[in-house]
Design a protein with these regions (language model features):
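Conserved glycine-bearing catalytic or ligand-binding loops at nucleotide- and phosphate-handling centers
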Residues: 1-20
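Conserved alpha/beta-domain cores
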Residues: 29-241
């Protein structure tokens, strides 16, 4: 029996020709992987960074072993979920240091706390909402619980200072207005953080992206939520997929 992991096919009682073809494809794949080091690019020469999505320091350690150019999304909410109190500045700093150390001088894009709606926090309950998905989630929660965002920015700044050569980028989730962008950018820059951005996850942010980028250094398109809010369709509801 032979299993072709590339196509998902199982060959029962493979003959010599089947085995020869599979071995040749396996060698070709190994050659391509061995020659895949360096910057990512399309066949016609356009550079495309290969960046990992991570949620923990362990994710960072595992991802950094591969020939990636860094992390394009560090979901920090996993530090905050399923606990009775927010992580301390010291605990957060320790985690961020581990992540930055894992990637060395490669880029790490950190998303600040993205909670609310489907990711509630017991220690940051702002009360019931009729429609949490359109309520105080993402940056809106941080703007009401300034203590949480300030502690996180302080920890990120401390980690950045502690890891020489770290390429840290920090962005806010669920931004919809210029005013929200200005609020976050001013606050983050006050901690000395070098690259400040926002997630484009709402139609409003997409429409205002040109103006937003006069304030923010970069923007990251959150395709899941942007598609969901644009199409008014819950991405978790199979009937609407």
């Amino acid at each position: 029996m032979a299993l072709d992991g590339g196509t998902g096919k199982v060959i029962v009682a493979p003959d010599a020709s089947d085995v020869s073809e599979l071995e040749a494809r396996s060698r070709r794949r190994a050659e391509l992987l061995a020659d895949s080091a360096g910057e990512g690019a399309t066949r016609d020469g356009h550079k495309v960074k290969l960046l990992a999505n991570i949620g923990t320091a362990e994710d960072a350690r595992k991802a950094a072993k591969f020939d990636l150019e860094g992390s394009g999304l560090f979901r920090t909410e996993f530090l905050f979920l399923d606990r009775d109190a927010a992580p301390s500045v010291e605990e957060q700093t320790e985690t961020y240091i581990k992540v930055l150390q894992a990637f060395g001088q490669r880029r790490v894009v950190v998303r600040t706390l993205d909670a609310g709606a489907d990711k509630p926090l017991s220690f940051a309950d702002l009360g019931p909402e009729e429609n949490p998905a359109l309520g105080r989630r993402g940056l809106r929660l941080s703007m009401e619980r300034v203590d949480l965002i300030d502690q996180q920015l302080e920890a990120l700044a401390a980690a950045h200072q502690a890891v020489e050569g770290a390429d840290l980028w920090v962005m806010a989730p669920m931004v919809s207005t210029i005013e929200e962008t200005e609020w976050f950018a001013e606050r983050a820059r006050s901690y000395g953080l070098p690259q400040i951005g926002v997630m484009v996850e709402t139609p409003a942010a997409a429409i205002l992206s040109e103006q937003i980028l006069t304030v923010a250094d970069f923007a990251s398109i959150g395709t899941n939520d942007l598609s969901q809010y644009t199409m008014a369709a819950d991405r978790m509801q199979g009937e609407l997929a």
